[in-house]
Amino acid sequence: MTRRYECVIRGRSTASPQTLFALVADGSRWSQWAAPLIPYSAWESLSPAGDSGVGAIRAVGRRKRPTREMVTIHEPGRRHGYTMLIDGPIHDYQAQVTFVEDADGTQVTWRGRYETRWRAVGAAYWLILRVVLGTLTRKLIIAAERQDG
């Protein structure tokens, strides 16, 4: 039986949705704002349209064994989504980062979901994902606020 898991992290930023989106959508710059969690980042290939949109593949993590992620959602200023291109105990990992502007700034929501057949793997990965997505969300907000000055 396949089990589904989801982790949702929320944050608030004074930066604009456009600034937040520009940082998260540029796969080559993740190592600049997400270090030391992400020490390496690069575009492996661009989208069929020749940009960083849907279909582009980034490599993030360790230079020798990066994680490959394909962009699945590219809505500038609103949403960025990706899937991990991995084989292993988890399947169908999908993540998206959404930006909603309101009177107080921008609400940032980073959501990751995946499937696995093993309950222990699902629970352990959820704990790891909570730390990773929480760290990425905080680092993204800090970098965007510095950039917006």
Can you say where each PLM-predicted feature lies in the sequence?
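Beta-strand elements of well-folded, non-transmembrane domains
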Residues: 13-15, 88, 101, 114-118
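A short, structured loop/turn motif at beta-sheet edges
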Residues: 14-18, 72-78, 98-107
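A conserved amphipathic terminal alpha-helix motif
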Residues: 113-149
